[in-house]
């Protein structure tokens, strides 16, 4: 057998590279966090999620495309949410969401260089922003890398919560930074 080195599918960038992607002021702000995980999200990505979720009283969701930046240690990172990819092929109710596989194809087609699926979003209309047991199983099965982030939004109660990694560890909302493009 011949061993051949191959670049990984997902490129983890160095933390200072975020300045090139989001500008000096926002980049420095994101680098100043002392917490393990910081989520930086463009206003446009937030709007894309909300435009998909708000008209509905059933669970809606999709994938998020962005970039990942490594910090000091392997379990410290900054995740940049750039684009929300709504799941159009889905089956949903007020308390459940089953996304079809087409959303993955759509996400891959809409990813630029160094952009990958970094997580997912979904709504809990008027149920509160929390990760249910099903959400935790989905995170562990489909978004198990340390940098994968799940965001749940209750647009009726105006709440959101953010979780990362296979163990669905909650990120304090103070570590979520929304930026202009």
How should these model regions be labeled?
Residues 1-117, 126-181:
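Conserved beta-strand-loop surface patch within small alpha/beta domains used
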């Amino acid at each position: 057998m011949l061993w051949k080195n191959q670049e990984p599918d997902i490129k983890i960038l160095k933390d200072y590279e975020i300045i090139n992607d989001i500008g000096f002021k926002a980049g420095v702000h994101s680098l100043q966090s002392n917490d393990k995980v910081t989520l930086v999200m463009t206003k446009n990505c937030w709007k894309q999620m909300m435009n998909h979720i708000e008209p509905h009283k059933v669970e809606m969701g999709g994938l998020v495309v962005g970039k990942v930046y490594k910090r000091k240690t392997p379990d410290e990172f900054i995740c940049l949410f750039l684009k929300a990819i709504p799941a159009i092929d889905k089956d949903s109710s007020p308390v459940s969401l089953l996304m079809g596989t087409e959303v993955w194809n759509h996400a891959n087609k809409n990813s630029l260089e160094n952009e990958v699926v970094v997580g997912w979003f979904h709504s809990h209309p008027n149920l509160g922003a929390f990760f249910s047991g099903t959400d935790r199983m989905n995170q562990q099965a489909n978004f198990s890398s340390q940098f994968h982030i799940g965001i749940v939004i209750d647009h009726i109660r105006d709440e959101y919560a953010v979780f990362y990694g296979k163990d669905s560890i909650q990120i304090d909302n103070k570590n979520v930074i929304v930026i202009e493009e």
